[in-house]
C-alpha cells in the first residue's frame, strides 16, 4: 500500500492513490483533484451522503451534479459503493439507475468501480442483494458490467485477485 505523503496545502503530493469519503466536502475534493493531477483520487460512496439506518434519504442524489462535475478531472475515479442504500424502492432498486447512468456517462465505466458497502448497509440490504442488483439489471451491458464489477478496480488499484 502506498503511504499518504501529501501536504494538501501545497501542490506537492507523492501518493499514487487516495480514496476519500467526501460527501460533505465535494468542493474541497474538487480543489484537491485540481491541485494534484498526478495523484489518482477515488470518490467513495458515489460521493453521496449515505444513510446508516432506515428510512432512506428523501433526496438521495441531491449532490449528483457536483459529483458529476468531478469527472472533468482525469485523475478522479468513483466507487459505486452504497448505491443500493440510496434507493427508495426495494430490491432490485430500480430507482437508482437514472442517477447512476449519469455517473457512468460522465466518468466512463473505466473510472467507475462497484462496491456493496454492505457492512454499513445491513439495515437496508444483504450482500447478495447488493451484488445481484448489479448482476441482474438490464441497465448494463455485459461489457459494462465486467468493467464495473472488477475490471476498473484492477486497473485503478493495479490489483488482481491472481496476485494474492
What are the residue ranges of the model-derived segments?
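Mid-to-C-terminal alpha-helical segments outside catalytic/metal-binding sites
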Residues: 102, 107-113, 122-164
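Short, active-site-adjacent cap segments at secondary-structure transitions
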Residues: 85-86, 120-122
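Single conserved hydrophobic/aromatic residue that forms the stacking wall/gate
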Residues: 1-12
